[in-house]
From Swiss-Prot:
Name used for this protein in its record: 5'-nucleotidase SurE
Cofactor note: Binds 1 divalent metal cation per subunit.
GO cellular component, one term: cytoplasm
InterPro entries, per the entry: SurE, SurE-like_Pase/nucleotidase, SurE-like_sf
Keywords of the record: Cytoplasm, Hydrolase, Metal-binding, Nucleotide-binding
Job description of the protein: Nucleotidase that shows phosphatase activity on nucleoside 5'-monophosphates.
Major localization class: cytoplasm
A single GO molecular function term of this UniProt record: exopolyphosphatase activity
Superkingdom of origin organism: Bacteria
EC assignment: 3.1.3.5
Family membership: Belongs to the SurE nucleotidase family.
Annotated catalysed reactions: a ribonucleoside 5'-phosphate + H2O = a ribonucleoside + phosphate
Amino acid sequence: MAKSGTKSLRILVTNDDGIHAPGLKVLEKIAHKLSRDVWVVAPEDEQSGSAHSLSLANPLRVRKLTARKYAVRGTPSDCVLMAVRHILKDEQPDLVVSGINRGQNIADDVTYSGTIAAAMEGTQLGIPSIALSQAFGFSGSANVKWSTAEHFAPDILKKLIAAGWPEEVLININFPDVVPGSVTGIEVTRQGKRDQSLVRVEERIDARNNPYYWLGFERILSNPPQGTDLRAIYESRISITPLHMDLTHQKTAKALNDALGTLAQPKRRPRSASRKK
């Protein structure tokens, strides 16, 4: 982002909750505090849990809502691709912001999240990208404290933009389930890990006596490790986690290379015999 000042930045806003989601409206307001050049390209319908998927078996349909706002019948990754490669192809975005998600995206959530996937897509396309999510508690998603993200996000984004971060890295921001005055701080964290025994499959019966199922997570109080995104949200802090696109575990790669020994050594291709004239 070489442009001086945020007001000259071209910002792309997207999400996974859909074009009519309240969190998208909040993020639009935040983006307009940072720049005059804000574009919105978001899914026509909710795409929560779509992860980093692309629509390869179906065509993308694009609906223009206003001069700078589009709905795409596709995934969050589709939306970013459509924006960068088509809608804004003549002058690409300087920044992608995705969210604000209804619910936290921390720990293992990052592998499922369409919100984070949109930021991943932006990162893959060489554009600095940030995912933002607002946690909600046991009272349910009807009581999401959007004011917390709206209050803190503008200054956080300005400082992140000024500082910059490496290519192949995206920024994942999560706001705790408290009102702005009850936030206890801001912490740069590492990705935590959930207890996968909390994943549940709930069976129900429809009107024709056929079973159907819902996937979900049990919500319990826990004591996550210090320094993790889980702990920060648990203690009412804003969590900022840099996520790296390269998922290779280098220590294991070296150990496997040592274990395989000569099998892991590349073989030289034999030279082809020169033709006789």
